[in-house]
């Protein structure tokens, strides 16, 4: 799906989320990262979620007073940008539940990225935001059969958009 859910779809998804949380689900996860794609190179549906849609799902957890949210939030590893802070704050305020976000890794090219992100996120961390990281170095194996890592770059958009059999080889 390459659009945000409409009001009816959002209500149905919220009802399913409520049912799942009541049955023991931990909460929900989402992503805004360009490289998180689904079938045929299309964006995962949650990538297109509107603020109203996210608010509705967060309210499900608030109303039940349980659950947590995990969100893949940083388009640049280790760098929390202003619009991402707004999403994080919205989820915290509307859910009143813990929200964990990825990804904080030390970077050779932006040595202060994690420190700056933690400073920027401090008010939200005080409200229950929890950044995620890894004790291991970030490494990637890349080949053209699974070019996942390139999806974050606008210059690769046409490659992922080409659905022809020739392009998919």
Where are these regions (language model features)?
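Polyanionic/metal-chelating signatures
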Residues: 1-8, 16, 21, 43-44, ...
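Catalytic pocket of metal/acid-base enzymes, prominently hydrolases
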Residues: 1-71, 75
């Amino acid at each position: 799906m390459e659009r945000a859910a409409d009001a009816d779809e959002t209500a149905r998804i919220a009802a399913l989320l409520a049912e799942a949380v009541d049955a023991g689900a931990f909460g929900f996860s989402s992503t805004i990262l360009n490289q998180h794609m689904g079938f045929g190179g299309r964006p995962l549906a949650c990538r297109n979620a509107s603020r109203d849609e996210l608010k509705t799902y967060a309210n499900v957890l608030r109303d039940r007073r349980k659950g947590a949210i995990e969100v893949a939030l940083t388009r640049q590893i280790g760098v929390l940008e202003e619009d991402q802070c707004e999403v994080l704050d919205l989820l915290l305020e509307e859910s009143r539940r813990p929200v964990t976000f990825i990804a904080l890794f030390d970077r050779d090219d932006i040595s202060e990225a994690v420190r700056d992100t933690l400073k920027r996120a401090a008010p939200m961390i005080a409200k229950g935001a929890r950044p995620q990281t890894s004790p291991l170095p970030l490494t990637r194996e890349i080949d053209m059969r699974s070019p996942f890592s390139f999806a974050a770059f606008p210059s690769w958009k046409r490659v992922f958009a080409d659905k022809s059999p020739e392009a998919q080889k």
